[in-house]
Swiss-Prot record:
Residues annotated as binding NAD(+): 177, 197, 202, 264-266, 288-289
EC number: 1.1.1.103
Residues annotated as binding Zn(2+) 2: 95, 98, 101, 109
Protein name: L-threonine 3-dehydrogenase
Cofactor(s) demanded: Zn(2+)
Assembly mode: Homotetramer.
Length: 343
């Protein structure tokens, strides 16, 4: 049986609608009928066919890794799922036999394979993944929100790396993940949550999500904002979401002594750092990759169920046949999360 899918067919700019074989269910797998998918920044990198994509992405391949769907097939060894379960899933498929996997730290698996990056993705009518990777979506969480659990998980993992209660938090980079991290920080009890960027559209989105201050660093100095907020000692926690060297160096300068930084944004490999700031301030820097399995996922569901409102971050919906419009708007930078409807 042939099914509709969005694939990287050629080693050049673009993503194409195509027909592929329906995936085959293995003994330990679930077959998921896709309802909604969201376009990730990674998918835009793959579309643009940048240097990272050229080194990483096999062609041809179905792409995508943010989704919600319904279980329509269950492998014979699988327990704990039923036909009709609504699920999203962890996009990092782990080996199960390295030291970290065996120690329960699966998010640190050294042999991780990415759905829609190293193997067939979710931008298709059906997806097969190991049942271990699936996460049941509670009934009181919408399909829209469930479809962005993957990037929301990046935000939650990054934001909850350190205690935020009563702390002043700086977030550099107001992409969707940065904005969601800011909303999480506010929700769990941070005092001042300041987010920086140069994209006014996205800073506006951050304001709708309740940040203390959204600062356009092309127009306003971070130091001035700190004075206005009555901050005398610097930020306690930094969440670096941009991969921008000047943003990171600005963060180092404005951190308080003993401050803690979580790094999710991917900088250029040759980024220079003022290590004096790190050493003499006694800063702690933690790298973040993916989501903790599955602690982050349970936290995501709980945060939404306890009143965290992420709906403003979803700015555009398109039918899957209009996927090109979705990619165009994502590439323009004038969007939050863009959802493609497969039903």
């Amino acid at each position: 049986m042939k099914i509709k899918a969005l694939s990287k067919l050629k080693p050049e700019e673009g993503i194409w609608m195509t027909e592929v074989d329906k995936p085959v269910l293995g003994h330990n797998d679930l077959l998921i009928k896709i309802k909604k998918t969201a376009i990730c920044g990674t998918d835009v990198h793959i579309y643009n066919w940048d240097e990272w994509s050229q080194k990483t992405i096999p062609v041809p391949m179905v792409v995508g890794h943010e989704y919600v769907g319904e279980v329509v097939g269950i492998g014979q060894e699988v327990r704990g799922f039923e036909i009709g379960d609504r699920v999203s899933g962890e996009g990092h498929i782990t080996c199960g036999h390295c030291r970290n996997c065996r120690g329960g730290r699966t998010h640190l698996c050294r042999n991780t394979i990415g759905v829609g990056v190293n193997r067939t993705g979710c931008f298709s009518e059906y997806l097969v993944i190991p049942a271990f990777n699936a996460f049941k979506i509670p009934a009181n969480i919408s399909d829209d929100l469930a479809s962005i659990f993957d990037p929301f998980g990046n935000a939650v993992h990054t934001a909850l790396s350190f205690d935020l209660v009563g702390e002043d938090v700086l977030i550099t980079g107001a992409g969707p993940i940065g904005i969601m991290a800011a909303a999480v920080a506010k929700h769990v009890g941070a005092r001042h949550v300041v987010i920086t960027d140069v994209n006014e559209y996205r800073l506006d989105l951050a304001r709708k999500m309740g940040v203390t201050r959204a600062v356009n660093v092309a127009e306003q100095k971070l130091d001035d904002v700190m004075v206005e907020l009555g901050m005398t000692e610097g930020f306690d926690v930094g969440l670096e979401m941009s991969g921008n060297p000047s943003a990171f160096n600005s963060m180092l300068k404005t951190m308080n002594h003993g401050g803690r930084i979580a790094l999710l944004g991917i900088p250029p490999s040759d980024m220079g750092i003022d290590w004096n700031q790190v050493i003499f301030k006694g800063l702690v820097i933690k790298g973040i990759y993916g989501r903790e399995m599955f602690e982050t996922w349970y936290k995501m569901a709980s945060l939404i169920q306890s009143g965290l409102d992420l709906t403003p971050i979803i700015t555009h919906h398109f039918k899957v046949d209009d996927f090109q419009q979705g990619f165009d708007i994502m590439r323009s930078g004038m969007s939050g999360k863009v959802i493609l409807d497969w039903e």
